[in-house]
Amino acid sequence: MPKEPASASLPTVKVSPRGSNRLKDGHVWVYRSDIVTADSVPPGSLVTVTDHRGKPLGTALYSSSSQIAIRMISSEPITDLPALLRHRIAGAIAYRAPLVMDTDAYRVVFSEADFLPGLIVDRYAEILSVQILTQAMDADSVRQVVLTELTTTLDPASIVERVDPRVRELETLPPRASGLLQGEKSATTFTMNSVQFRFDALEGQKTGAFLDQRENYAASARYAKGDALDVFCYQGGFALHLAPHCTQVTGVDSSRPALEVADQNAALNHTLLNGKEIEWIEANAFDLLKDYSSSAHPHEARRYDTIVLDPPAFAKSKRDLDAALRGYKELNLRALKMLRPGGILVTCSCSYHVSQSNFLEMLASAALDAHRPLRLLEVRGQAKDHPILLSVPETSYLKCVIATVSR
């Protein structure tokens, strides 16, 4: 972790041996169960962290409500939080400069992975989308520093805050609506891999679009062929990348508003798609795959040359793991049954609690049950603008497997 200059005293939080060992191993979180003392520490404070004997371990942001009570920001003592924030934001922007030269949409700040816990910033052309996830980052003084630095460095037309009410409730923060923080523009068009997308900062999931899949969109396009099915297509990310390489593409999602945006995105890319029409189907993915893969009437079962599965996170916690793996297996089993010999499967999981080994074991089991031998072409993760901090495994969450059925 970057070192900062030493400075004056801060409130002190003492952690247990287990908590201090976790920090010494390079992680940046300490859970509430490992707090020994945090007497009279105001919510969202900058604090000095010590081990149970009182030895300083560094400086952190403190949450009085979250199960993650401590988020480390330096292994050295600091008090000038504004200077630290400006330095870290500038560092995050510089880190990405050589990685995003071919796109105007990317993640600018990725929380712990950029040593800025509780802050996420995405860029969509001239609009920045910000998420504040902790008590410390929600302080008015911190907000102002963040906005000023982003404005000075990136000169956006607008900055929009996307609010997750569940997170604010967990952090016992007052309710707040998503909205413009500065500027007036909330909608634009951005480009990924030469494909254009409509973006409205006050609509959609997460901070607006799935930027973490940008490199996987391009990779899937290299293998795409024939008739393609994009399941959980949302606003058409995979479908639009597949279409120039396929004879026919169908996108499936349960959200009518998302499909309406997907259709608008297809219209934006009319020339790139050579006038091809993408079929958009509003349906429950599990029900549709069950219907399409039915063996009751083999002559009626649908067959495809390329299938993409990009479902939402099935495992929000460890206790969801078994159910999540069952869900993933059902989806992949049905998709494998629908692929023609030599067909391409692109299958994803954005659940951190489903490890890469969990996911590959599930996929091997599905292939065995479907009697469709699978050969791996690529095992991929999130785009490089979503960096992975090796000492914080939670920063690695996206799995994307590209495979081909042998027969």
Give the role of each language-model region.
Residues 127-139:
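A short interface-forming secondary-structure element
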Residues 81-85, 138-146:
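Short amphipathic alpha-helical segments
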Residues 109-122, 142-210, 218:
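Non-catalytic substrate-recognition/targeting regions of SAM-dependent transferases
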Residues 178, 182-407:
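Rossmann-like S-adenosyl-L-methionine
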Residues 1-125:
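Non-catalytic accessory regions of SAM-dependent methyltransferases
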